[in-house]
A protein has these predicted regions:
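Short, acidic/turn-prone active-site loops that include or flank metal/cofactor-
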Residues: 1, 41-46, 117, 160-161
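ATP-binding N-terminal substructure of ATP-dependent carboxylate-amine bond-forming enzymes
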Residues: 1-42
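Short, charged, surface-exposed secondary-structure boundary motifs
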Residues: 3-4, 46-52, 166-168
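Residue-level detector of structured alpha->beta connecting loops
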Residues: 10, 34, 62, 85-86, ...
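Short, well-ordered alpha-helical microsegments
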Residues: 23-24, 77, 141-142
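A conserved helix-loop-beta module that forms one wall/lid of the active-site cleft
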Residues: 38-101
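Internal nucleotide-binding/catalytic subdomain
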Residues: 105-227
């Protein structure tokens, strides 16, 4: 319908902001009709659409990321949590969940309940068919948005994003409770490190995988005591 509207009304340029239509392939549809559109194609939008994919990509290309394991079987996830996990630990629904598909579990009991919630009860729908279990890291979270043309990346200013609901960060993650910019923790040294080891390597990795990314990439950084 959107492509029909753009065609009928001779829209010069369409900018897609929402994750869902990008992951669904709306850019491919527009391009197939010769319409100008800004955003990643379906095979590149998976970077945001699948946490398991993005974690595997970072691991393959040595881009810094928290230690993790991916699971598509809840029983195997539970075995891992009972035998190998260190707490607190983070459970993430693989797919899009409006920024809410992340659970921080303080102990095994909470983690077992989290697996049930994400993978069995499908609280986040098909987004929970696969789940990422990730090392819990403490530090300052910083968000950086960037413009990408498939090869070159230009970052915007940093932002301090507050995701958790309730006063004192007592609630669950949300799509965002508030933000301010720039972040005082995003120093010149951090910027230089990220440009060298995170930003450009991510663009290059996507191109190497045949998934050239054109659009805006969101980088969620965790600045820890170890870097």
């Amino acid at each position: 319908k959107l492509a029909d509207f753009a065609q009928e009304n001779q829209i010069d340029l369409t900018i897609i902001g929402m994750d869902d239509p990008l992951v669904g392939g709306i850019v491919d549809e527009f391009e197939s009709r010769g319409l100008r559109v800004f955003g990643p194609r379906k095979n590149a939008a998976i970077l945001e659409g699948s946490k398991a994919f993005s974690k595997d990509l970072m691991k393959k290309y040595n881009i810094p990321t928290a230690a993790y394991e991916n699971f598509d079987d809840p029983e195997k996830a539970l075995v891992y949590l009972r035998t190998e996990a260190k707490f607190p630990i983070v459970l993430k629904a693989d797919g899009l969940a409006l920024g809410k598909g992340v659970l921080i579990c303080q102990n095994l009991q909470e983690a077992e309940a989290g697996v049930k919630e994400i993978m069995e009860d499908k609280k986040f729908g098909s987004a929970g068919n696969t789940m990422v279990i990730e090392e819990f890291m403490t530090g300052r979270e910083v968000s950086v948005l960037s413009f990408v043309d498939g090869k070159t990346i230009k970052t915007m200013t940093s932002a301090q994003d507050h995701k958790r609901a309730k006063d004192g960060d007592q609630g669950l993650n949300t799509g965002g409770m508030g933000t301010f910019s720039p972040s005082p923790f995003y120093t010149k040294e951090v910027d230089e490190f990220c440009k060298k080891y995170v930003y450009q390597p991510t663009v290059d990795a996507m191109a190497a995988e045949g998934r050239e990314f054109k659009g805006i990439i969101f980088f969620g950084l965790m600045l820890t005591a170890d870097g």
